[in-house]
Amino acid sequence: MEYSTFGKHIIVDLWGVDFSLLDDMYFLEHHLIHAADLSGAHVLNVSTKEFDPHGVTVLVLLSESHLSIHTYPEQNFAAIDCYTCGTTVEPQIAIDYIVSILKPNEMHIRRLIRGIGEIVNTD
């Protein structure tokens, strides 16, 4: 079987997110898994890390690639990354869901197409 190298990669910076949401590893883990499911991705594994005194990283390993969040609660900031290979998964659905639960005051986003030669910025 031949596989396509085509992929969609979305990177997002969120500012003005509630401290308590960004410092709750279990809340974020639950919602990232749900976001992956909504996008049509298949979750293989989840890795989490709480930092001292604050901050969380959640990495959701997908059959199609990955979904991750790194938080800096003291700055009310989160960095989200979602990369999916192929055409059967829509990473924007995962991103939209996460943004809807974190409710940032400000968002910066880049959408890239990868695996077709040159990386294409679709913004």
Swiss-Prot record:
Gene Ontology CC: cytosol
Taxonomy, superkingdom: Bacteria
Protein family membership: Belongs to the prokaryotic AdoMetDC family. Type 1 subfamily.
Pfam families for this protein: AdoMet_dc
PTM description: Is synthesized initially as an inactive proenzyme. Formation of the active enzyme involves a self-maturation process in which the active site pyruvoyl group is generated from an internal serine residue via an autocatalytic post-translational modification. Two non-identical subunits are generated from the proenzyme in this reaction, and the pyruvate is formed at the N-terminus of the alpha chain, which is derived from the carboxyl end of the proenzyme.
Cofactor or coenzyme needed: pyruvate
Role according to the record: Catalyzes the decarboxylation of S-adenosylmethionine to S-adenosylmethioninamine (dcAdoMet), the propylamine donor required for the synthesis of the polyamines spermine and spermidine from the diamine putrescine.
Catalytic residues, chain numbering: 65 (schiff-base intermediate with substrate), 70 (proton acceptor), 85 (proton donor)
Gene giving rise to this polypeptide: speH2
Swiss-Prot/TrEMBL site (Cleavage (non-hydrolytic)) positions: 64-65
Gene Ontology MF, one: adenosylmethionine decarboxylase activity
UniProt EC number: 4.1.1.50
Species of the source: Bacillus anthracis
Catalytic activity: S-adenosyl-L-methionine + H(+) = S-adenosyl 3-(methylsulfanyl)propylamine + CO2
Keywords of the record: Autocatalytic cleavage, Decarboxylase, Lyase, Polyamine biosynthesis, Pyruvate, S-adenosyl-L-methionine, Schiff base, Spermidine biosynthesis, Zymogen
Name this protein carries in UniProt: S-adenosylmethionine decarboxylase proenzyme 2
Self-association state and partner proteins as the record states: Heterotetramer of two alpha and two beta chains arranged as a dimer of alpha/beta heterodimers.
Record note on cofactor: Binds 1 pyruvoyl group covalently per subunit.
Metabolic or biological pathway: Amine and polyamine biosynthesis; S-adenosylmethioninamine biosynthesis; S-adenosylmethioninamine from S-adenosyl-L-methionine: step 1/1
